[in-house]
């Protein structure tokens, strides 16, 4: 089925941005709480890579999962980035303002026969490396059953090189799935490079499957190191002590925090003090390309 003109226009605009050779990156936090040092370390790495390339760095707020959003979190994210000297280009992009775009793509996928309803619960699929195709051949039904709606899955060919299995593109609670929204946004915004934490590497196979379904090339992906607590666990937004507010209350200023984040990326010794611009200049003078080992 042909892609509707208004969706083609979105894709073509993104393709033009990517074709002009300009680096286009983004930082895409969720407003589910205050950013912790791991989030900020990824933001710094993404910003450094974009600025070294003389490119564009966008701020996208992934706020589709509204029950998990915290009041004031969007403003707090912007304030934290400003305080650290991480400037973005243009206005912040809210995914919640783009629901119509995602819904249009869902409608096109469904009308083209690429989707099927699935009633498997997370508990039923726990521990499986890939979706086994339980509901693929029909029978699950698109409507309400036992007071529940189905999730919608994208049919992924068994020969798909990433072996992701059929990808959820709309959750059973009606929310657009992360895997679809982020792919649509990277394409429509002309993103050339995605810098994110190592914990999101596992999302790559499913996202590549969505790109293939759209017959589009994915951006380049770079996965940065994670920050862990004293027990070796990944930092969580639930831990207030891992955020900027706790560090500022201890008397740390922006150069001290940038130095702390830089050391976590391997770009300086612990205890260094420098601004984001100074770090950018230092790496450039030394010929070190941020995000490239």
UniProtKB/Swiss-Prot annotation:
Its cofactor is Zn(2+). One of its GO terms (biological process) is glutamyl-tRNA aminoacylation. L-glutamate binds at residues 26-30, 62, 178, 196. It is an enzyme of class 6 (ligase). Transmembrane segments: none annotated. The keyword Cytoplasm does not apply. It holds the Pfam family tRNA-synt_1c. Zn(2+) binds at residues 118, 120, 131, 135. Gene3D superfamilies: HUPs. Its EC number is 6.1.1.-. A motif ('KMSKS' region) lies at residues 234-238. A motif ('HIGH' region) lies at residues 29-39. Signal peptide: none annotated. Binds 1 zinc ion per subunit. It comes from the Bacteria. This is Glutamyl-Q tRNA(Asp) synthetase.
